[in-house]
């Protein structure tokens, strides 16, 4: 039976996310005759410009809520599972890079995010990202705490009238992004941060940095592409996930300082097969990360294809540069290059075609490789190159989105602010809009991360002792060891 969202016009919090989105639907899309184009508008808007932009104005006659679409909702659920798989993939990827005495601790930092953020997102994180009660361009409200009234009594109500995705499926999908983002930061801090400090950092960073960023970009905030907003576009998380985690990693690594034995006794990765396994799982999961962000099974082929194409270009570019410069392509380089290409295409996946996808993957990979080598030259201890891959790769991808975005994939009906920028200033104008969004993200995330770490450091401390660092954090933090010392 079709369901409708309860009226909330009289609510002291004002219109809900569903009502606000419905207003946009009835005001802007009513004149679009092609049903497939109308549908694409919902998906493109949700993925790139913010699911609940605050448009204002009187809504037209309310439409009866249609049942959720089985194929599209299945894509959402399958995409959620794929994105969740990325976090164990990241654990293997990071774990392979560390010394054997720290591999469990490194992997646990990613796995623990699945537990902590998985609960935190349901309790309050989703609400801070997507509820519109505060009517703020910076952060959501508290009306959706505990996912209250999200999905209706049976959990099958659509996200908005006529929208084929259920609200619960959307909340689940977005929660997977919230889980992996702080896990990405851990790569800069492994082998020296205490697990207690990591617990508190994950909690506060997710609430005070990730959820506001998600709101500002996707939840109707000022960085989005809806009418009256900045006009920046981010298809699946170039700013929200990759730049945010990369900048946080850079700041955190600088505040923590280097490992006690670094760089005098740098060790090679202890398990390269782990790195390759992790990269493969990340690549596979990225189909959900980018592809399912289209929210439509019939039109998801484009971001699926641009995603894997950019990954291939990134891997090839990294290997060719190594081959030319060092004489041999490495397995670690192949894995890292693929991830760099995936990071680069994330903000652009639904806005570009194949040629630009190859260019973005290749250029992001090259930029990340240069950044990794600069880091080594200046001896900065970002342990696993988190900023160099996610910060630099995300920045490169976000800026190149401005250069390569196709007007056909950024229509004015669905991305009014971004389309206006493209119309008045072309791709160069969109490039500078993207640059403004990137610079804001750098500043906001850097300042917020520094404050969070300063408070945690004053309260419980940040680092383990030099003796504990020498012993290894597997045993110190967890009382376990990955390998039998008699056979290792």
Residue ranges of predicted features:
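Glycine- and aromatic-enriched membrane alpha-helices
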Residues: 3-40, 44-488
